[in-house]
A protein has these predicted regions:
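Short, hydrophobic, well-ordered secondary-structure elements
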Residues: 40-65
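Alpha-helical repeat scaffolds in large eukaryotic proteins
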Residues: 29-32, 55, 62, 188
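Secondary-structure edge/capping motif, primarily at the C-terminal ends of alpha-helices
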Residues: 27-36, 65, 133-136, 194
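Flexible secondary-structure boundary motifs
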Residues: 66-162, 166
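Amphipathic alpha-helix face/heptad-repeat signature
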Residues: 13, 20, 50, 115-118, ...
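Charged alpha-helical initiation segments
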Residues: 1-44, 48, 212-221
């Protein structure tokens, strides 16, 4: 009984990453049309909140490692120090994620393969939404998506997730259920990549718990 009381009275930290990822997943559920039908605004929620959840995951794991006792594996101390330094230096989410992967798994994340490529593409899309630039001039019935949105079309050509209809608005093209699903899958895969292959430690237990939340959300929607 004393052990139970000790656990009950022990300070705990509520982790937000899973909850935020749930927001991205819930936004998928409300889209009831064909996967590549454009103009589904909830898809933008999935794009933005999937990345927010990923950044929350990185920040919370850094803070969690920093609050651990010194009686931990050396890699936990290295993770806490280097990830904390990267955050103080305002390093990009891309860099911090690759740094976390290297420290925890002992392997560099392959930037030329999945899941990194989709992750990088997603970060770029989120940034384009947050820092939206004007659309190009568009003549209805004449201008094609390739002409009006050449950069977007080139980046996503092989994904087959953009809206299939022509549109003067580039954001209309990414407002599809297919884009929303791809965003959440990409984040869940990169979280799994970071959490897999870590050594046994208290940090690893937390990583496993958080990873299971992300993967269970994915399993529940697909």
């Amino acid at each position: 009984m004393s052990d139970i009381n000790d656990i009950a009275n022990r300070p705990t930290r509520m982790l937000e990453a899973g909850l935020l990822f749930g927001v991205a997943i819930d936004a998928i559920r409300v889209i009831k049309v064909e996967p590549r039908t454009g103009g589904q605004r909830s898809a933008l929620v999935s794009v933005v909140f999937s990345v927010i959840a990923l950044e929350s995951f990185v920040n919370e794991m850094t803070e969690h490692a920093q609050n651990m006792s010194s009686i931990q594996l050396a890699e936990v101390g290295v993770f806490a120090q280097m990830m904390g330094d990267a955050e103080e230096d305002r390093a990009s989410l891309d860099f911090r994620l690759r740094l976390a992967h290297w420290i925890l798994t002992g392997r560099m994340m392959d930037r030329g393969s999945q899941p990194y490529q989709d992750f990088a593409l997603l970060i770029g899309l989120r940034n384009d939404l947050v820092h939206t630039k004007p659309n190009r001039l568009y003549t209805y019935g004449k201008t094609t998506n390739e002409e009006a949105h050449s950069r977007l079309m080139k980046r996503f050509r092989d994904k087959n997730i953009l809206a299939e209809e022509n549109s003067a608005s580039w954001t209309h093209l990414v407002q599809t259920r297919a884009v929303a699903e791809w965003s959440c899958r990409s984040v869940a895969r990169v979280v799994n990549e970071v959490c897999s292959g870590t050594s046994q430690s208290d940090l690893q237990k937390t990583l496993t718990f958080v990873n299971q939340m992300f993967q269970s959300y994915i399993a529940g929607i697909f």
